[in-house]
Amino acid sequence: MTTEKQPQRALIYSHDSFGLGHLRRCRAIAHALVDQNPSMSVIILSGSPIIGNFDFRRRVDFVRVPGVIKLRNGDYTSHSLDLDIEQTVAMRASIVRHTAEIFDPDLFIVDKEPLGLRGEVAETLEMLRQRGTPLVLGLRDVMDEPSLLATEWERKNVVPALEKLYDEIWVYGLPQICDPLAEINLPPEVRRKMVYTGYLEREGARGAPATEHAVPFDRPYLLVTPGGGGDGEAMMDWVLRAYEYDARPPYPALLVFGPFMQNEIQAEFAARVSRLRDVEAITFEANIEPLIQEAAGIVAMGGYNTFCEILTFDKPSLIIPRTVPRMEQFIRANRAQELGLVRMLADDGVRLARDMATALRHLPQQNRPSDVVVPGLLDGLPNVNRLARRLGNRGSQPIAAIAGGSA
């Protein structure tokens, strides 16, 4: 009988660009690893400018690299330094490599970008590969419109890295919802590295740190959240116009603008909120779980993390997905609606107030996600832990056997 060796140190690269998604996903994984492995320590590498706003468990820490911003046209620029993007990436790559050299992880998980931003993780992957460190690429359930992703990965020469460097590809979702690499021409040996873990269940309200903001209503309310908020103004405007249109809404609304919504847009929305009896707003809440727990329904754009929270807290939800610059949210929301997990209201560009008002009136009476039986839907974190433990004992049975098989 083989004794499983537990990794003692995990290093997680959080691809930071636009919004909160990558950081919050990596944080959830880090917390799950230390919760189940008492000797585990985890470092998250991130350039997020607000990573310090989040609480981290004991034995989880972060190294912040110089931040970058992904512009709406897809280009990147330095967040705050007066450096061009090439210099910024060179600094980031050096910090990533040096951290890996000193920390010497037993497991390296790279989030979303196989080679990191502009290839900044490539040298670190090569170095750790030579040391025998297990290397894992973690992917969300939906990446982008398949044809666009195929073109992007071909341009970045990703497939050879998947062949030569990575031991496993963990997909934080289920194949019946989406295969994120469906139209990528992957060699069979790369396909065999793919494992679907299920979605990443979030901390229940009891286990989460206390929210900084008290619930402002003494009756059921709708929580409206665009995630990071950098591209959430259209959804927020639509919801506000619905409340301006409907003088007697059945439920009040709590709006969470998000830390990346532009200040002038927040100020404009806040002025409109002040004129509405049944709407309150806050800028940001790092520990949003208690607010979700108390809500009668959720209105969101349907990013990966919000979708996981909707499933975790079993909330009736209305999803208004963006379609630019990626189709990720639309693909996820459309498939989830087909399964009966959520309802989607597509942004037609007109955004009639009465359409939103009608959808909001019906929202709390919608089915909950738990009304649909999807085996393994929220098994992501237990499977991540099992996979991590097995990777600590290289040479044992194939990893794919642990979490339900390969793609």
Where are these regions (language model features)?
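C-terminal amphipathic helix plus adjacent low-complexity
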Residues: 3, 354-407
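Conserved nucleotide-sugar phosphate-binding/catalytic loop shared by glycosyltransferases and other
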Residues: 7-9, 14, 32-87, 91-93
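A short, glycine/small-residue-rich beta-strand->loop->alpha-helix junction that serves as a flexible
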Residues: 14-27, 51, 232-233
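Donor-nucleotide binding loops and adjacent catalytic segments primarily
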Residues: 30, 202-297, 349
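Short N-terminal targeting/anchoring amphipathic segment
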Residues: 96-118
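A nucleotide-sugar donor-handling region in carbohydrate enzymes
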Residues: 139-234, 260-263
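A donor-sugar binding/catalytic signature common to diverse glycosyltransferases
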Residues: 287-331
